């Protein structure tokens, strides 16, 4: 673990997180220290797909997505602190406590997420998070995340036999070890 602080650009974020458009909610990491804290930014654009329905005529960034953006920031901090995931592993958002929303986030806002490592116990890592716009707090929460072991893949068969024209075991899981 190093004590350097630095930024991460979108290419590095894409290398660390499995999320992609429209669910990647971290545009840039402004600063971090491994095992300590991370500051990231989400530029909120009117073109976000959820603004069509949340809410027509008065677009507001959904609160659950503010929490998801902070959770993605914790994932980046965890990966930079503990190493990247192995094939088959995932980093799950495992819980949230004391979430509070202070004011709406709207198109044109630049949301800064600040997350801090609190502790790790029994495979769960606890973080605190604060989201701000123009220095004003918009959301606070305590989040828990868990790094999974490589999972067993479940493949659903969806074959149709050509000779009989009937479905063979459609929808039945075929479990394979990964």
Swiss-Prot record:
Q: Where in the cell is it found?
A: Cytoplasm
Catalytic residues, chain numbering: 54
* Example of a GO MF term: (3R)-hydroxyacyl-[acyl-carrier-protein] dehydratase activity
The family database entries (InterPro entries) matched by this protein are listed as: FabA_FabZ (IPR013114), FabZ (IPR010084), HotDog_dom_sf (IPR029069)
GO biological process: what's one of them? lipid A biosynthetic process
**EC number(s) given by UniProt:** 4.2.1.59
Where is this chain primarily localised? cytoplasm
For this UniProt record, the keywords arranged alphabetically read as follows: Cytoplasm, Lipid A biosynthesis, Lipid biosynthesis, Lipid metabolism, Lyase
What are the GO cellular component annotations?
A: cytoplasm; membrane
> Is the keyword Cytoplasm assigned to this protein?
yes
Catalytic activity from the UniProt record: a (3R)-hydroxyacyl-[ACP] = a (2E)-enoyl-[ACP] + H2O
Instruction: Spell out the NCBIfam families in the cross-references.
Output: fabZ, PRK00006.1
Family per record: Belongs to the thioester dehydratase family. FabZ subfamily.
Task: Tell me the function of this protein.
Answer: Involved in unsaturated fatty acids biosynthesis. Catalyzes the dehydration of short chain beta-hydroxyacyl-ACPs and long chain saturated and unsaturated beta-hydroxyacyl-ACPs.
Question: What is the name attached to this protein's record?
Answer: 3-hydroxyacyl-[acyl-carrier-protein] dehydratase FabZ
Name its species.
Yersinia enterocolitica
- What broad taxonomic lineage does this protein's source fall under? Bacteria, Pseudomonadati, Pseudomonadota, Gammaproteobacteria, Enterobacterales
């Amino acid at each position: 673990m190093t004590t350097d602080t630095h930024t991460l650009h979108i290419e590095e974020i894409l290398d660390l997180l499995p999320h992609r458009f429209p669910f990647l909610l971290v545009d840039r990491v402004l600063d971090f220290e491994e095992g300590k804290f991370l500051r990231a930014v989400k530029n909120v654009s009117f073109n976000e797909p959820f603004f069509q329905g949340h809410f027509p005529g008065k677009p507001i960034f959904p609160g659950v997505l503010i929490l998801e953006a902070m959770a993605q920031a914790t994932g980046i901090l965890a990966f930079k602190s503990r190493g990247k995931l192995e094939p088959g592993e995932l980093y799950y958002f495992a819980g949230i406590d004391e979430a509070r929303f202070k004011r709406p986030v709207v198109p044109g806002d630049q949301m800064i997420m600040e997350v801090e490592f609190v502790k790790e116990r029994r495979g769960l890592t606890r973080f605190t998070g604060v989201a701000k716009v123009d220095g004003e707090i918009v959301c606070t929460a305590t989040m828990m995340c868990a790094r999974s072991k490589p999972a067993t893949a479940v493949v659903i068969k969806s074959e149709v036999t050509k000779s009989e024209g009937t479905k063979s075991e459609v929808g039945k899981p075929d479990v394979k070890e990964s």
